[in-house]
Every structure is written in C-alpha cells, then in structure tokens.
C-alpha cells in the first residue's frame, strides 16, 4: 500500500492509513456508483474520500507501470490549482492499493468544503436564483482554469 500524506495533515495519518479498511462512519455519501464519494469526520475535521474502483485489466497494467493513478493525479492537480490561485479543496492524501503486484484501488482524500454541489443546479432542491448564481460561479471557475492554462 502506497500512502502519500500532505505534511499539513500528518496528525491525521492513523485515520488516513485506516481508510482502505472502510471501518469509519460516513457522514454523507454523494456518489456510490463505479466510484464512491463520501464525507467523513476524522477528529475535529471533515474530509471527502473518493474511492476509485478497480479498473479494467488493461488499466491496471497501465497504472502499475506507465501512468500515475487517478488518485495521485487528483492530489497533484489540486496542489497545482491552489498554487495557481484557483480555489479548490485542499488535497490531504492519496492511497494506492496493489494486489499481486498490480494496481487495484485508489483513494483521494481532500478537505471538505461546505459548498453546494454542481449537480444541485440541475435538481429541484435549490431556488432558481441560487441555481443561476451557481451556474455563473461554474462559468467563472472554468474561465479561471482557462486563464491559468489548466484547460
């Protein structure tokens, strides 16, 4: 198991290393399909864990030898965004699990930010004015990515 923890979150190492056992209380589950996204509380802080399910065999080989895992890339992109002044959830850690020498499962952990979900702008739970503001913020964010040559 490869565990990379941002030095700022070293105090949470025991919680982070226990994530693959999934023996923690989930505060909220946002997505539970191919990948799982859930909010958890470790100590005094809320975090988001994204678990990347086992990829197809060819991708297991690619992530083992040729390409960084999605978890590692998510961590590195979050660091890059913050360095470029693009607001995003601070990256906390990533975990890569190998079985029989091959990549199997990845986890990306970030701080939880209490913002509305992008998917909320398509549902009926928000007032129309709030949906409009969220769509505007999404366009501004995308523009910021372009101006910083990220997209």
Identify the meaning behind each predicted range:
Residues 4-8, 15, 104, 136, ...:
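Histidine (H) residue identity feature
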Residues 118-127:
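AlphaC helix of the protein kinase catalytic domain
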Residues 17-119, 143-147:
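Conserved ATP-binding subdomain of kinase catalytic cores across diverse folds
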């Amino acid at each position: 198991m490869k565990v990379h923890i941002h030095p700022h979150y070293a105090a949470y190492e025991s919680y982070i290393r226990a994530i693959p056992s999934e023996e923690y209380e989930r505060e909220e589950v946002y997505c539970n399909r191919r990948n799982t996204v859930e909010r958890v509380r470790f100590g005094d802080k809320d975090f988001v864990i994204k678990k990347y399910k086992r990829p197809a065999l060819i991708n297991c080989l690619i992530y083992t030898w040729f390409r960084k895992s999605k978890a590692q890339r998510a961590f590195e992109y979050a660091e890059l965004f913050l360095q470029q002044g693009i607001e995003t959830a601070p990256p906390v850690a990533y975990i890569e699990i190998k079985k029989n020498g091959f990549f199997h499962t990845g986890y990306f952990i970030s701080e939880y930010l209490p913002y509305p979900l992008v998917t909320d702008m398509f549902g009926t739970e928000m007032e129309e004015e709030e949906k409009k503001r969220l769509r505007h913020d999404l366009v501004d964010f995308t523009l910021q990515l372009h101006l910083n040559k990220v997209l």
